[in-house]
Amino acid sequence: MLAGLISAGTAEAGVRNYFSPQFEGARVDACLVAGECGKPAADAFCKLQGYDKALIFQREPLAMCRRIDSGQICSSAVCTAFRQVKCFTTKTDLAALSP
């Protein structure tokens, strides 16, 4: 019975690292809006790339970056962009469920 469960469908994990990730030609801002920085913005970036969520991320100060939600450019001394975002997804092969 266990063999039948295993062959009924497969789940495949997908992981990808994005170094200096960009959105619309600019580095990705580490904030969606004020107060929603870090994980929410990293998750939004990963979802745009077709992944479920961000596993890890690193930030760095940068003179210019773009917010994913609004496309707004931050161009001041206090901008923070992602240096790296590692995205993760689990894909299920539905074709394997057919008899």
Model region roles, listed by residue range:
Residues 11-99:
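Secreted/extracellular ectodomain signature
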Residues 1-4:
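Sec-dependent N-terminal signal peptides
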Residues 6-10:
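N-terminal signal peptide c-region/cleavage motif recognized by signal peptidases
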